[in-house]
Regions:
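An acidic/histidine-cluster motif and surrounding catalytic segment
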Residues: 1-112, 117-148
């Protein structure tokens, strides 16, 4: 089972996701049944915040004085069956803006999955690793939204 510790850092999130803890509980239950994640006991924290705090975090940890959609802070890349993976932070304003012509939830899922994969060691520094990460994101998103 995969568990998320959800930290609601900005009130606007509840306009789109009424109960973030239940939302992640349901999504992660489904993700835990995805073949790659079966029999894994992973835990991570996710901060649902705003542009102001994201800009501050981005500067503090990456020395970039601008906001961003998602930041991931892996705890370790040595995974055991039971592992704390690390922390993710996501900006409400960026997700909301990108979702302007589509679904907020689908855009949010895309971004937190991207952050989650960073916790698992995926990156997009080179074309090959970018494609590998993008393929895994798409596999998970398709699994989430497949018709039963």
């Amino acid at each position: 089972m995969i568990k998320a510790n959800v930290i609601l850092g900005h009130y606007k999130w509840q306009k789109k996701i009424k109960n973030p803890n239940n939302y992640f509980k349901n999504k992660l239950k489904k993700l835990s049944s995805f073949s790659y994640f079966k029999k894994k006991k992973y835990e991570f924290s996710i901060l649902l915040t705003n542009n102001k705090q994201m800009k501050s975090l981005n500067y503090k940890f990456r020395k970039k004085n601008k906001t961003t959609d998602v930041l991931s802070f892996p705890f370790s890349y040595k995974f055991k069956k039971n592992s704390y993976l690390g922390d993710i932070a996501i900006s409400y304003e960026i997700i909301n803006k990108r979702a302007n012509n589509s679904s907020f939830i689908k855009e949010f899922d895309k971004i937190w999955i991207h952050g989650y994969l960073h916790l698992l060691g995926y990156d997009h520094k080179k074309i090959k690793s970018f494609k590998k990460m993008k393929n895994k994101e798409n596999l998970i998103l398709n699994y989430f939204y497949k018709k039963n």
